[in-house]
């Protein structure tokens, strides 16, 4: 199926001089069979850009995927090498994780969230995506008469894909206009249906980079307790609200978390961003002690036990992957121990993302773009791993498609559950500072081609 024709107001791209080979971009789009580029997933955008780069030899400014742009923790690398030398590659790891890692995850949660969780209830997973899948497979099956997850959006698009693959229904709303006390009424409008099994959000938020406050988290916690919904808190960007220092173990301030307001929670913690360990696919799934021991008879429709923790480990996780990479567990245990002992400041190593975001946002706004999610309650949005942008007069689909011809990639906000469908998400991680001049040139070129001409002089 060919792409829809270019809108007349744009003119024929092939007749314009653009930074990328326009004919090659158009051919790649037409061959792909894509009808709506705004609906493409992160990986589909990546594949499209890889194809164009491979055919043209021209490089894009890559902002579509949150690939860490920093080297991995050397502590983790060394520990993994040593584990491999000891021969762990020949041994299946326990599904529930190795003891040293479970201890360090528990310590990390205590040190940086001020929350106590039994090490037995701290599990390694093959990335946080597997942790989310395990949650959907168990938590959303605790009650046969419930529908599924309520997503407090915008959010990570793949989590909804996981629900679709499982055949689960879900609900969603864009939280941006429902911050503060207004959040309660919005949540009630969904919880009152009696169909919500779980509530999921990311904090800091991917893609808007807003950060829910303790007061908002308390609202979520109280309503979740009242309605019996489990809160799944995605902490993929743990401690990365750089406006505050969350880096000191056991010392306030602590990373904001619903876990301090309820015992009805699951935490998804990633090693990909904070420790730049994305390639080894290892994350952390932390289940509260109370939830771990909760009985839900409807679980026995799928699992041998009605205990949530047992069903999660020996039902869902076992079926997904019989354990997480043995050597990677030793890597994560080592870096967590260094952080817990105060020997490694985990935040200092990733501040570069915030610094780059500050520069990049200025480059966009200097060239006619605007930041879509630009405030966090009554404060300017923080600089971090992501930011959102739009261009006057263009829809998100039009902007995403046009930017392909200017060598800039991103994803459409519409795929994240955002109501701001005119916008795109930019990730700051993969672009290097040495590429900033190229980004500036391409944005200026885009603005020259798309900016409205000045009106006649008065």
What are the roles of these predicted feature ranges?
Residues 6-15, 107, 111, 115-117, ...:
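PLP-dependent enzyme catalytic core of the Aspartate aminotransferase-like
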Residues 286, 388-390, 427-429:
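Short hydrophobic/aromatic beta-strand micro-patches
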Residues 261-351:
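Conserved core segment of the aminotransferase class I/II
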Residues 69, 272, 377-379, 415-418:
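AMP-binding (ANL) adenylation modules
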Residues 18-25, 31-130, 181-182, 336-343, ...:
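N-terminal small-domain helix-loop-helix segment of the aminotransferase-like
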Residues 85-227, 232, 238-262, 266, ...:
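Conserved core of the PLP fold type I
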Residues 326-329, 333, 346-361, 371-390:
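Conserved glycine-rich beta-strand-loop-beta hairpin in the small C-terminal domain of fold type I
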């Amino acid at each position: 199926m060919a792409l829809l024709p270019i809108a007349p107001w744009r003119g024929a791209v092939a007749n314009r001089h653009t930074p990328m080979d326009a004919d090659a971009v158009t051919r790649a789009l037409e061959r792909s069979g894509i009808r709506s580029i705004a609906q493409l997933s992160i990986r589909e955008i990546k594949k499209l850009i890889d194809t164009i780069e491979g055919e043209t030899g021209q490089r894009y400014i890559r902002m579509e995927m949150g690939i860490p742009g920093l080297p991995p923790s050397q502590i983790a690398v060394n520990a993994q090498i040593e584990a491999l030398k000891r021969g762990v590659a020949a041994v299946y790891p326990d599904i529930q994780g190795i003891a040293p890692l479970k201890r360090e995850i528990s310590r990390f949660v205590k040190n940086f969230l001020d929350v106590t969780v039994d090490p037995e209830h701290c599990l390694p997973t093959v990335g946080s995506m597997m942790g989310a899948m395990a949650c959907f497979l168990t938590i959303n099956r605790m009650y046969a008469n419930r529908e599924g997850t309520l997503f407090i959006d915008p959010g990570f698009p793949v989590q909804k894909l996981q629900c679709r693959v499982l055949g689960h229904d879900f609900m969603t709303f864009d939280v941006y206009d429902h911050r503060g006390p207004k959040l309660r009424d919005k949540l009630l409008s969904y919880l009152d249906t009696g169909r919500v099994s779980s509530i999921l959000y990311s904090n800091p938020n991917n893609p808007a980079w807003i950060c829910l406050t303790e007061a908002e988290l308390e609202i979520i916690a109280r309503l979740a307790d009242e309605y019996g919904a489990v809160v799944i808190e995605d902490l993929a960007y743990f401690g990365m609200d750089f406006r505050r220092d969350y880096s000191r173990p056991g010392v306030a301030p602590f990373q904001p978390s619903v876990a301090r307001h309820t015992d009805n929670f699951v935490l998804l913690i990633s090693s990909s961003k904070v420790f730049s360990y994305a390639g080894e696919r290892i994350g952390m799934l932390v289940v509260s002690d109370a939830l771990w021991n909760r009985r839900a008879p409807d679980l026995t429709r799928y699992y041998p036990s009605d205990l949530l923790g047992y069903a999660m480990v020996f039902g869902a996780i076992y079926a997904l992957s019989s354990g997480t990479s043995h050597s990677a567990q030793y890597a994560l245990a080592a870096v967590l121990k260094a952080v817990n002992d105060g020997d490694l400041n985990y935040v200092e190593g990733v501040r570069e993302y915030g610094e780059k975001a500050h520069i990049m946002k200025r480059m966009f706004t200097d060239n006619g773009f605007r930041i879509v999610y630009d405030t966090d309650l009554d404060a300017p949005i923080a600089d971090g791993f992501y930011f959102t942008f739009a261009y006057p007069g263009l829809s998100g689909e039009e902007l995403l498609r046009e930017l392909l011809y200017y060598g800039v990639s991103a994803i459409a906000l519409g795929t994240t559950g955002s109501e701001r469908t005119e916008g795109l998400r930019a990730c700051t991680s993969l672009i290097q500072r040495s590429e900033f001049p190229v980004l500036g040139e391409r944005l200026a070129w885009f603005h020259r081609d798309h900016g409205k001409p000045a009106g006649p002089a008065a």
